[in-house]
Structures are given as C-alpha cells and as structure tokens.
C-alpha cells in the first residue's frame, strides 16, 4: 500500500521510483494499492487504516504526515518512509541520521546537505546582505532545515530573517513581505511550498528576488538554483528495501535509513533569464 501526502513533482517521482523497483523484481506478481491524501494529514490516517484493514504486506509512507499516520496505525506491518527529511523529528525520536530505527519502520530521507546549500547562496550571491528564509511553520522538517541553514548563513556573515507561513492561504502575503525585505530567499524542502511554487514565483519574479531552493521540484517552479537529491532515486532505494523485505531476505528492523548520495547543482534557466542571472558552467539545467 502506498500513501502519498499530495501530488507534486517530488513526491510523484519518489512513488514512481518505488513502483519501478518493485516491478523490476516481481513484474505483474505484485499488487500495489495507492492512496493520495490531497495534502490533508487526516486523509493519510484514513488511507493507512484501509491498508491495515486489508492486511497489506508492506506500507510505503510518502512524506512525513504519511509516515506518522502509518506509525500510529500499526507496529507489525513493515513501514518504509520516503521523502521524509528527518525521521527523528517525524517520529519524536532522538536524531536518527544514518541509524537503524528498529521496530517496523525504516525508509529513505530527502535531506540534502544543508551546509552545501548555504554555500550555494555564498557562491551565487556573495554581495547579498539579507537572506529571507521562507517556509511552512506547520511542517516540522521545514523548521529543522531553516534553523540549521540559518546557522550556516549567519556564520558566513549574512543577516537572516525567518518568514513563516501557516498554509497556502497566507503564502502569497508572507512571500511578498520576504521579497520586499530580502536580497535573496531560501526555501527548504517543504511540501506546501512545492505544491504552490507558482504562487511564490508570481511574487518573487516581478520583485526581482532570486530563490535558492531545497529541492529540484521547488526550484523548477520558483527558484534559480538548487543542490538537490533525486526523488526518483530515494523512491527507488525504498523500493529495493521493500523487495528485500518481501522476499524475506532482510528485516525492516535492521535496515538503516537510506540516502541519495548523488547530488547535482541545478538551475532554472527560464527564471535565471527573467532575473538577468548567469549560472556557472557546472550547474545543470533542470529537465536538461
């Protein structure tokens, strides 16, 4: 059973990677049930409860609210998360980076090196002074990323200010304030931002303020550059973990959290052109 929080580019890619890994191993012998929560965590619980009632062999929880719903619903069915930034925060545990969670939960993380994303701001905008940190306050993983990146950026001499929005309803207004007060904006890996990147773009492009994004999907919608993991890849890694579990080769309880170690500097040529920016040659065009 696959529970995906909402349909946007990054999460869709993770689901596809997962399914491709299962199909490569099992062909048509695997039955996949999919549920999309439409961005509502309450729907995640309903979808997961259905999977538990059907006694599925494994659950893929795509994004943090899906994972927390699955963890609450069963302690026996193997659960693999994907597109979850920090499992410790998601599950109220101690830091779990590179660790085995134990129990019935493991998965893959979409956390990119935040220090290197801060370095990207310095590389591309060395003369900027004010960096706006735009994020959804309702997403614990976004708060974690913002706190971490702020520390790196302030250590480089930037003045940082947080611009938190509650949901899509105040996103445009908060983005406008950030654009008015910032030389450059950083947006972390954030589901609300990813699902509404065009709303951010409609503000920052006319304002002439560049966005450094935490992942490729957001960058493709409103950013100029990102250092991004591949969501397809972390989905595929989760799928390969699922194959091992379903074949009885390995227990979920002994599996460490998986990461995509292949990182690419990517840029959005369209928005760069609109803002009059030229990217260094080692930046690859998104979709190119």
Residue ranges and their predicted role:
Residues 11-32, 147, 151:
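Short, polar/charged alpha-helical segment
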Residues 1-3, 80, 132, 212:
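Short, well-ordered beta-strand segments
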Residues 18, 106-153, 254-271:
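An alpha-beta-alpha
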Residues 34-96, 190-214:
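Beta-alpha junction/loop-to-helix N-cap segments that form part of ligand/metal-binding clefts
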Residues 244-288:
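Hinge/cleft segment of the Venus flytrap/periplasmic-binding protein
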Residues 140-209, 215:
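Pocket-lining segment of extracytoplasmic ligand-binding domains
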Residues 87-128, 229-250:
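Hydrophobic alpha-helical segments within soluble ligand-binding/sensing domains
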Residues 1-19, 33-43, 138-142, 190-195:
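Extracytoplasmic "Venus flytrap"
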């Amino acid at each position: 059973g696959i529970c995906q929080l909402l349909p946007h580019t990054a999460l869709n890619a993770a689901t596809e990677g997962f399914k491709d890994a299962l199909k490569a191993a099992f062909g048509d012998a695997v039955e996949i049930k999919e549920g999309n929560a439409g961005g509502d965590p309450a729907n995640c619980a309903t979808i997961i409860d259905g999977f538990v009632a059907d006694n599925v062999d494994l659950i893929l929880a795509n994004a943090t609210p899906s994972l927390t719903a699955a963890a609450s619903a069963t302690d026996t069915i193997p659960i693999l998360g994907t597109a979850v930034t920090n499992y410790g925060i998601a599950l109220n545990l101690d830091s779990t980076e590179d660790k085995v969670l134990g129990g019935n939960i493991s998965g893959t993380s979409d956390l990119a090196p935040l220090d290197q994303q801060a370095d990207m701001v310095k590389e591309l905008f060395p003369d900027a002074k004010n960096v706006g940190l735009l994020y959804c306050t309702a997403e614990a993983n976004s708060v974690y990323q913002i706190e971490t990146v702020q520390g790196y950026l302030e250590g480089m001499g930037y003045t940082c200010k947080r611009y938190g929005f509650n949901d899509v309803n105040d996103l445009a207004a908060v983005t406008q304030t950030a654009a008015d007060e910032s030389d450059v904006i950083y947006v972390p890996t954030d589901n609300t931002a990813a699902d509404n990147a065009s709303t951010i773009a409609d503000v920052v492009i006319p304002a002439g303020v560049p966005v450094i994004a935490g992942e490729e999907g957001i960058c493709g919608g409103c950013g100029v550059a990102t250092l991004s993991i591949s969501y397809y890849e972390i989905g595929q890694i989760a799928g390969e973990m699922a194959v091992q579990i379903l074949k009885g080769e390995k227990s979920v309880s002994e599996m460490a959290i998986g990461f995509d170690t292949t990182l690419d500097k990517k840029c959005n040529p369209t928005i760069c052109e609109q803002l009059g920016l030229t990217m260094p040659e080692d930046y690859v065009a998104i979709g190119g």
